[in-house]
Amino acid sequence: TDEGSVDKLGNFSFFSSDSHTKYPPTLETVWYDSKWDTGSLDPLTSANLEDMVIYMKGLRPEYKENSKAKFRVVGKERFPSTTYSTTPADLTIKYLPSGSSFYSIKDAETNDVIVPFSTSSLISCDSSGNYFNLDLEGYQPERYYSLEFRIQSGSNTVDETDQYFDEGFTFKVSI
């Protein structure tokens, strides 16, 4: 839209959550806030991406309404190769592909998509591993939400593949 224009382009009506409708009104705002700094972490290689598992590190069952939370996402090889070292392979954190790892959030009861896979849901990385920050303001309290992940490998090539991970990760937003 052109903010400087005086042309009338239509009306916009928005109702409060007290309107007693079946579905609460929504207003969608998105922004790109992904950061990428791997530190000394190693990447999951393309061979690892074909057979990997995703798990959440420190996922709490409940988060307070209007809070801000950091969700840690870890990808690892399903069957790590045998190596002889002082650190077990299960404890070695590797990072997911940059710019092609996304999260999505759904209402666990209705399966309505709250946060779709998009550039505004890119997973970030720091020296401790992958993560995403979530502002829970506007989420309906006393509801459960589920997390799903999409990992793209071979982006913009003939071998591009999308893998979806819906491992049953849920959390509740409480009052």
Predicted regions located by residue number:
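Short beta-strand elements
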Residues: 21, 153-175
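Aromatic sugar-binding surface patches on proteins
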Residues: 113, 122-144
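Internal, hydrophobic beta-strand segments that form the core of beta-sheet-rich folds
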Residues: 1, 137-162
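Residue-level signal for glycine
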Residues: 110-111, 155
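Secreted, disulfide-rich extracellular signaling modules
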Residues: 1-62, 74-81, 101-104, 109, ...
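Extracellular Ig-like/FN3 beta-sandwich strand-entry sites
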Residues: 66-68, 98, 129, 140-148
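A short beta-turn/strand-edge loop motif at beta-sheet boundaries
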Residues: 62-67, 77-98
